[in-house]
Amino acid sequence: MTAPKPVVLCILDGWGLDPDGPANAPLLADTPVMDRLMATCPNATLTTFGPDVGLPSGQMGNSEVGHTNIGAGRVVAMDLGQIDLAIEDGSFARNPALTGFIDRLKSSGGTAHLMGVASDGGVHGHTDHIIAAAKAVAGAGVPVVLHAITDGRDVAPKSADRFMPALEAALPEGARIGTVIGRYYAMDRDNRWDRVARAFVAMVRAQGETAESAQAAVAAAYGRGETDEFIAPTVIGGYAGMRDGDGIFCLNFRADRAREILRAMAQPDFDAFDPAGLPDFAAKLGMVSYSDEHDGWFDIVFPKREIVNTLGAWVAKQGLRQFRLAETEKYPHVTFFLNGGQETPETGEDRFMPDSPKVATYDLQPEMSAEEVSDSFVAAIEAGYDLIVVNYANPDMVGHTGDLEAAKAACTAVDTGLGRALAALEVAGGAMIVTADHGNCETMIDPETGGTHTAHTLNPVPVILVGGPEGATLAPGRLADLAPTILHLMHLPQPVEMTGRSLIR
């Protein structure tokens, strides 16, 4: 029996299952295609959080973690747990990259500028890491200025008024907060350089809103109607900006939302906006590798670990062709993260990236670029690829806005595109796995507070088999089981490094 062609992995980013949950966008939306698939096709559920995806117990999953595990076909120990352990056992403070950073600033007489997301969300960073780094650097006699990036997306929308007092109280002598900036500005990943420029100007030139303390900055932002994600870049107290001989240390451990602001800080020929005032840094340090290019500009505390024989690499070794597709908001996930942190495409791997719409927030255009993604999806099915991996960003990106009606529209847009792709797949004689990397839009109201819920969830996600072997069923599992399942459908052997198991029974 010949393998179906193409075999498709369709990831509905942020589409979880929560039958009892309030404000469940997928259930409330008009989604006839997904309704039909769940009623007529083999389906099961996947776990996307905690140790099943290489995270600490109870830690919610995210798109980086999800796509890394999906592509690896094994549980990958993620950076959050590795960093936590290093702080606990004391090896973080002794790390040669960190001690080298400290030594260079001692020699230059400069200040260490620490920047990172100031919440306990654990998706991009963690306040515990900020505090540990500040203690290590200030404890060595180097003055520390913290550029605190408020979250409001992976935690409650208005929780900085809780995080900031605790953070200020925990900072050691010799460390203070210099700026407070919403992640909307400091952690953009879709080339909204006007936003990044405002964060840059506050950090580098000490220009922006002003407040006497971080707590006052948050209170003023709330008075302006801003939630944590959108806090306007604010300069704290007498912070006067960066100077020659200073150092920069980015504490975020997830790459995609750190790249742009760090590019502005370090790229020699940066021209997305005028980087006037950028000092001659004595040292530049990153918690992790942010990209191959960034590795040329920053020393790294925790270098990336090679993941051998990912799904993409293994399919390429069989001489087969594959296609990766997502709009720009999720493009790194179906390429860089799915390929185990490798930037360069595999042999025979083609990619396409429609631009995400240029709107302030995606509730204003919940369809995002789903139609363009669907156009390319259908074309790829018709083009004869062996493997197609596509990500629909809408359920996650619109779910993060907390707008239920917009999230329902997002789900409907994705459902429509999925229907078009399935029609083309039936003609081609292919097979598809429909799933998600984590939950989000199925819980739009916080069941504990009754307020808006904008974060990811611990809910299971669906996994659906379309066009599989006759009589097949699916077993429940975890994200690491998806690559083995895809290889099963493609009639390919599973590399020994993949310890996941096919879900097909």
Curated annotation (Swiss-Prot):
Q: Which SUPFAM superfamilies match?
A: 2,3-Bisphosphoglycerate-independent phosphoglycerate mutase, substrate-binding domain (SSF64158), Alkaline phosphatase-like (SSF53649)
Gene Ontology terms: cellular component? cytosol
What residues bind Mn(2+) 2, as annotated? D13, S63, D437, H438
Q: Which reaction does it catalyse?
A: (2R)-2-phosphoglycerate = (2R)-3-phosphoglycerate
Q: List ligand-binding residues for Mn(2+) 1.
A: D396, H400, H456
Q: Which GO terms describe its biological process?
A: glucose catabolic process; glycolytic process
The EC number of this protein is: 5.4.2.12
Q: Which region is the signal sequence? A: none
Whether Metal-binding counts among this entry's keywords is yes
The pathway where this protein functions is: Carbohydrate degradation; glycolysis; pyruvate from D-glyceraldehyde 3-phosphate: step 3/5
Q: How does it assemble?
A: Monomer.
Protein name, entry field: 2,3-bisphosphoglycerate-independent phosphoglycerate mutase
Q: List the top taxonomic levels of the source.
A: Bacteria, Pseudomonadati, Pseudomonadota, Alphaproteobacteria, Rhodobacterales
